[in-house]
Amino acid sequence: NLRYGAVAVNHWAQQPMVTQDVDFVVAAEAVDRTVSLLEEAGFHSERFEWSVNFKGCSAVSLQLSTEDFYRDFPSRAVAADVHGILLRVASLEDTLKGKIKAWSEPERRQSKRLKDLADIARLVESHPHLWNMLTDNLKQQVQPPEKT
């Protein structure tokens, strides 16, 4: 399993933020098995066109992406200690690409797009070389990184 959303951003950014969901990806052939395992563990699942969302007993939900965009993320994932738990998270560049994709979706709620923009800014602040990956539109909305 690979974490690619806010959990990955919190790993790569210097200042972590709270998240209410864990976004993850598995190999395409493992989706049905993953859904079964989580349902057996007590999670309720709901399938959508691009994801399977899970809700358990806590306020934190899980979102399994089934979108082709994320298919190669696991091959570039890195091991990371996230709050004392060893996880595989999306590479730094893939984390940014995922956030840019989410921010670019016009049907997303404004509050989510603003959070995506903040996540993009946090990543660029922590890793200035990522500035070159931003679109011109994003460069107008995110401050350039400080030169050191």
Describe each PLM feature range.
Residues 1-148:
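Compositionally biased terminal segments of proteins
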